[in-house]
Amino acid sequence: MVMALVLIKLGTGEYLSLAKSAKEEIAKIKGVAKVYAVFGRYDLVAQVEAPTLEELSRIITDKIRAIAGVVTTESLIVGF
């Protein structure tokens, strides 16, 4: 099992509604264990788990980055 913390930056605009809807959509993705709204450089942090590194990459690039409002992501792969 591979796990990563994905730091997510959202676009500007109706921030509160955008953050809430993006958080809800990300939480529905298979492999996403938890999603937190945070303050600071990033807006959301998602804990993502997958059986392989390739599957983890697919979830992040094909699913999370496709959510409306997501501008950038940075992934921190957990080593142990």
Which residues are covered by each model-predicted region?
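A compositional/biophysical signature of low hydrophobicity enriched in polar/charged and small residues
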Residues: 1-80
